[in-house]
């Protein structure tokens, strides 16, 4: 009997680990679906603050639409003059790495953003290029760390650790911990940890508004760098559910049109 118990214990542990990992991924997946839109258009204000509180402000126009299993996003900077015309195209692929291109009007050239640049700063802000696209859950090991109350909301703490060093280099962090509200599956906050395991950045989501399709959209997002004191905020100025833009609009040719 004792021998049977010793044989069964590792199996029970393995099964419980698999169930926990599956549950954690399911929570992360539901959190993504809670804010997933097939099509939308919006304008937003990006505010970039340095460690002394000095601000730079950028106005952005953004359009996104899903074609089959692929989500395509095109954003253009409207102001100020030094960034006006800068544009980015993001192709969110379901089962492979995302594709990104950026057009710099000063160079009159469109170039591809390679995978090692996705964890780099998005236009000088504390957001990364990767933050502009939807996360690929298959690139992480997911684990429930427990529960926590954040701003009066009962949340799951779900850790997503990069599968390998290559993904760490691509993302710009080693792991992240998301605080996901249990009733709505809306992500309230995400903590990012650097390659040494130290807290790096914290992103908070606020002013969620329910749309006509039953999904929610966060009208404010803030990223705080805990290591250098800098922060950046994206505030949605106008939001439109749906889009009539054709698929050929989401192309590198459109990037270069002013």
Cite the ranges covered by each PLM segment.
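Positively charged n-region of N-terminal signal peptides that target proteins for export
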Residues: 1-6
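Bacterial N-terminal signal peptides
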Residues: 7-16
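Sec/Tat signal peptide C-region and signal peptidase I cleavage site
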Residues: 17-21
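Mature-chain termini and adjacent capping regions
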Residues: 22, 41, 46-53, 80-82, ...
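N-terminal mature ectodomain segment of secretory-pathway/periplasmic proteins
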Residues: 23-106, 110
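A short, amphipathic edge element
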Residues: 25, 56-57, 132-145, 197-202
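Short amphipathic beta-strand and strand-loop transition segments with alternating hydrophobic
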Residues: 62-65, 143-149, 206-208
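Gly/Pro-enriched, hydrophobic low-complexity segments
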Residues: 89, 99, 103, 109-113, ...
């Amino acid at each position: 009997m004792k021998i049977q118990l010793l044989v069964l214990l590792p199996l029970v542990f393995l099964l419980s680990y698999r169930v926990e990992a599956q549950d954690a991924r399911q929570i992360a997946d539901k959190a993504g679906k809670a804010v997933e839109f097939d099509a939308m258009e919006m304008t937003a204000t990006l505010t970039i603050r340095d460690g002394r509180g000095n601000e730079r402000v950028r106005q952005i126009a953004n359009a996104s639409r899903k074609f089959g299993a692929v989500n395509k996003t095109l954003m253009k900077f409207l102001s100020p003059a030094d960034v006006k015309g800068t544009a980015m195209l993001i192709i969110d692929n379901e089962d492979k790495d995302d594709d990104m291109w950026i057009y710099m009007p000063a160079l009159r050239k469109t170039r591809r953003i390679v995978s090692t640049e996705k964890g780099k700063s998005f236009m000088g802000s504390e957001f990364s290029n990767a933050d502009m696209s939807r996360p690929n859950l298959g690139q992480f090991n997911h684990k429930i760390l427990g529960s926590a109350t954040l701003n009066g909301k009962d949340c799951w703490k779900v850790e997503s650790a990069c599968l390998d060093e290559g993904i760490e280099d691509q993302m710009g962090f080693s792991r992240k911990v998301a605080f996901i509200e249990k009733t709505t599956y809306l992500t309230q906050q995400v903590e990012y940890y650097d390659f040494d395991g130290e807290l790096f950045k914290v992103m908070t989501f606020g002013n969620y508004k329910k749309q006509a399709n039953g999904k929610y959209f966060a009208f404010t997002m803030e990223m705080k760098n805990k290591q250098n004191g800098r922060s950046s905020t994206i505030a949605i100025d106008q939001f439109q559910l749906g889009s009539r833009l054709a698929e050929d609009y989401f192309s590198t040719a459109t990037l270069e049109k002013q």
